[in-house]
Amino acid sequence: MNNIRKGDEVIVLTGRDKKRRGTVLARVDADHVLVEGVNVVKKHVKANPMANNPGGIVEKTMPIHVSNVALFNPATGKGDRVGVQEVDGRKVRVFRSNGAVVGAKA
């Protein structure tokens, strides 16, 4: 069971975007995620008339390693570690600090 999934709200722990919050857009592979508004770089794109691409400088969200983000716990207002517990015969993710189920409405 993955600790961080698409749609989760995370907080960045290290790097240029430290303490910035965002939503996970995609899981690139087992170790990297795309986070909305985090690790945005400017890429120079060559024009391609066949694909109707004018080219120029484009802002693109780049992947960030999962070890550099933590799931945001709204109860504490901080990043938190995640554990797995069995509730009603199903495995669910829970915050380690307070035991609340991840994604449950308060």
From Swiss-Prot:
GO terms for biological process: translation. It comes from the Bacteria. The keyword RNA-binding applies. Keywords: Ribonucleoprotein, Ribosomal protein, RNA-binding, rRNA-binding. InterPro entries: Rib_uL2_dom2 (IPR014722), Ribosomal_uL24 (IPR003256), Ribosomal_uL24_CS (IPR005825), Ribosomal_uL24_KOW (IPR041988), Translation_prot_SH3-like_sf (IPR008991). GO terms for molecular function: rRNA binding; structural constituent of ribosome. It holds the Pfam family ribosomal_L24. Coiled coil: none annotated. CDD domains: KOW_RPL26. GO terms for cellular component: ribonucleoprotein complex; ribosome. One of two assembly initiator proteins, it binds directly to the 5'-end of the 23S rRNA, where it nucleates assembly of the 50S subunit. Part of the 50S ribosomal subunit. HAMAP family: Ribosomal_uL24_B. Belongs to the universal ribosomal protein uL24 family. This is Large ribosomal subunit protein uL24. The gene is rplX.
